[in-house]
Structures are given as C-alpha cells and as structure tokens.
UniProtKB/Swiss-Prot annotation:
Binds 1 zinc ion per subunit. SUPFAM superfamilies: tRNA-guanine transglycosylase. Belongs to the queuine tRNA-ribosyltransferase family. QTRT2 subfamily. This is Queuine tRNA-ribosyltransferase accessory subunit 2. GO terms for molecular function: metal ion binding; protein heterodimerization activity; protein homodimerization activity; tRNA binding; tRNA-guanosine(34) queuine transglycosylase activity. Signal peptide: none annotated. Keywords: Cytoplasm, Membrane, Metal-binding, Mitochondrion, Mitochondrion outer membrane, tRNA processing, Zinc. It comes from Pongo abelii. Its main location: cytoplasm. One of its GO terms (biological process) is tRNA-guanine transglycosylation.
Length: 415
C-alpha cells in the first residue's frame, strides 16, 4: 500500500492510495469516504441495488460490534469475511464500533475493551481481538483502543492520559501478534489517535503512534456538538501536523458535509458515510447542492431549489425552538410532511440516481406514510449516490482550486 499525493493546498490533500488489497491491484481516491454497512451489508440494499449506485467507494466499513458474535463461524469458514458476505472483490475496513450506535461508557480496562452486539456486551482482550481479525481477514482494521474519551464532554486529565497509555499498549500488543500471524501479514493495522480535548495528550498520542509501524491513522473522539467545533478543529490541525505525509488519515464520527470540508482543510483523507443512513432512517432525502459551477441554463431551477432550502431552514429553526425533531438538518427534506403528497418532482432535479430518474417525492411520501419497506430502499439509493457525488465534487474542486467556492456554497446551506 502506498499513498500518492498529487496536490496539497492549504492542508487539503488530493491523491490516491494505490497497491491496496491483498493482491495490490486496488486504488482509492482521497479525499473520499468508506461505504457504511450493517453486518457487512449496505443498509436497506441488496448487492444488485448497490451496484446500481454510481460512485460507490472502493472500501466498505465493517464494524466489529456487529461481527464479533459470528467470529467462530468465520473461523471455521477460513476464507475471510469478504467472501462470506458476498463482497470478495471489495476492500474491507473493520472498525471497533458502529458510528451510529453510542456505546455505554465504563467498560474499558487495562486488559480489554468492550464492544456491543445485538446480544449484548462482548469483552475484547488483545488476543481475542486479533483472533477475530484472523477470522475476518480484513484489508485494514482499527487497532484496539480506549475510545471512551472524546471532545464531547470535559474529562479529567488523569482519565485522558490513561486513555492514551492504554491505546498505545494495545497497539504494541496487536502489532506483536500481527507479526506472529501468517494470515494477517497482508492486513494493515490502523493506529488510533486518542486524547480527548487535551492538546498535550493528543500530541503525545499522535507522536507515539507515528513511531509504530502502522499503515495509517484513525482520528478518534473528534465528534461533538457545534459549540465545541472550534476546539475540535484546533486540536485536529495540531494532530495532523504531527503525522507523516505518506500515510492515510481517517476520522471517526464525522460525516456532515460542512464538518467534512472543515476536516479536509486540516489534512483528513477518509470519512465514514453513516450520514446518508441517518437521513434515510429519518424518512428524509439529501437535497443540498454541491455544484459550485452551475449551468447558467439551470439558474431558474437552482433559484427554486434555494427557496425550498430557505423554507426548510426556517422550519428546522421552528422545530428546534419547540424541541421537536432536532436531528433534521438543512441538508435534507422531510418527505413525511404532507406538503409532498402532491409534489411530482424528483427528489433532486438533475440527479442521476435510480430513485430520481424513476420516482417522485409524492411517491416516496406515500411509501413512508404507509410504512412500505421500499421507501428505505429508494431513499438509501438516492442518499448514498448524492453523498458519494459530494466527495467527487470535493476532489474536482481541489483539482481546479475551487474548494473555497464549494465550502461557501455548503456553509450557506448549513444550519
């Protein structure tokens, strides 16, 4: 695996990760995202419908929490999780936790980390964790770490220091066991940067992890509420400055379009794509614009779309003041609302996804209010394609030095 940078502008990194996978014949563009999955499958979608989506990332994200209870079956299967789930050609990255599902705190010790499956808590020692990775045989996997400390809330310096110490100890033990394993020789360990909101510990974690022979870095614990954004971004800039240029940087828990752009400007390469899934689960469709050089002939359509965005933002503000449905963002529209009952427009004008080419907002509204499973399928197809298209436009904007225009467009739509 090798990271090839073609351009670095104001911290933003444009390039490719080449020689990926066990055969070394895969590539992945950066900045980019991973394909979010549930137990190895894209939510709501079959493999056939997934193949109808344009721009699907080369690497899928699996979560250890959803696969841990099946590791004995996979160990007996002996051919890895990729073939087992019907994705033998895909690159696979195994993370510890599902970014959508919060984990209870207080279950990390000096010897183990807990993950939470459908059946409950699964305690992971280093040896058990590496045995499961041997059964899964992923291309990349997140190292075991103490990720209970984040920027979300203030934590004592003593607890933050313990988090960094534990994570480094877990990393050393995992690297030792990887050396002893023939099966995992072609798998890449991703080192985890911890440290909460304490600058000194963040920098120590970054410097010490960079000394180890890891294939890349996961920036953990940077998710949080808007009030902590400035602090998080300052920490992020300092951490990425300590990391080597020739290894990829992933970030967990960050997926909103406006936050993605802020992180890219601070040197982050890869993101999780759970945001489209969350939008789908709310019965919403992504409608934000990322075309920073619109066709003049489409100006009228763009103006109509802008008016709708303004109405949507006003509605969100009203909901926030009443304490209702605060999760909905200005990047989406809520198709459960009655006003879409007779709206025969596509979800997004000009969108090339299967849903927009074949169905209308009114039809999706009908599917949602009647609780039809097809609603989730069509919304997931659209939301994934829209989100993956956003990353394509980010790369194009970097190539043409237009990221500032794209960022301005996205922030005008953010609430």
């Amino acid at each position: 695996m090798r990271l090839s940078l073609t351009k670095v502008v104001n911290g933003c990194r444009l390039g490719k990760i080449i020689n990926l996978g066990k055969t070394g014949d895969h590539t992945m563009d950066i900045p980019g995202c991973l394909l979010y999955t549930k137990t190895g499958s894209a939510p709501h979608l079959t493999h056939h419908t997934l193949h109808n989506i344009h721009g699907v990332p080369a690497m899928a994200q699996l979560t250890l929490s959803s696969l841990a209870e099946h590791h004995e079956v996979l160990r007996e299967y002996k051919e890895g999780v990729g073939k087992f789930i019907g994705m033998p050609e895909s690159l696979l990255y195994c993370s510890l936790h599902d970014p959508v599902s919060p984990c209870p705190a207080g279950y990390v010790t000096n010897k183990s980390v807990s993950v939470w499956s459908v059946a409950g808590r699964v305690e992971m020692t280093v040896s058990k964790f590496m045995a499961i990775q041997q059964a899964l045989q992923p291309d990349w996997f997140q190292c075991l770490s103490d990720g209970e400390v984040s920027c979300k809330e203030a934590t004592s310096i003593k607890r933050v220091r313990k988090s960094v110490d534990r994570s480094l100890l877990f990393l050393d033990n995992c690297l030792r066991l990887q050396e002893e394993s023939e099966v995992l020789q072609k798998s890449v360990i991703i080192g985890v940067i911890e440290g909460g909101d304490v600058m000194e510990e963040r920098l120590r974690s970054a410097r010490e992890t960079a000394k180890r022979p890891v294939g890349g870095f996961l920036l953990d614990g940077f998710q949080g509420n808007p009030t902590t954004l400035e602090t998080r971004l300052r920490l992020l800039s300092s951490v990425t400055a300590e990391l080597p240029e020739d290894k990829p940087r992933l970030i967990s828990g960050v997926s909103r379009p406006d936050e993605v752009l802020e992180c890219i400007e601070r040197g982050v390469d890869l993101f999780e794509s759970f945001f489209p899934y969350q939008v789908t689960e709310r019965g919403c469709a992504l409608t934000f614009s990322f075309d920073y050089q619109p066709n003049p002939e489409e100006t009228l359509l763009q103006q109509n779309g802008t008016q709708e965005e303004i109405k949507c933002m006003d509605q969100i503000k009203k909901m926030e003041t009443t304490g209702c449905n605060q999760e909905i963002t200005s990047f989406e529209i809520n198709l459960k609302e009655k006003k879409y009952q007779e709206d025969f427009n596509p979800l997004v004008r000009g969108c090339s996804c299967y849903c927009c080419k074949n169905h209308t907002r009114a039809y999706i509204h009908h599917l949602l209010v009647t609780n039809e499973l097809l609603a989730g399928v069509l919304l997931m197809m659209h939301n994934f394609e829209h989100y993956f298209g956003f990353f394509h436009y980010i790369r194009e904007a970097l190539k043409s030095d237009k990221l500032a225009q794209l960022k301005e467009l996205i922030h005008r739509q953010a609430s």
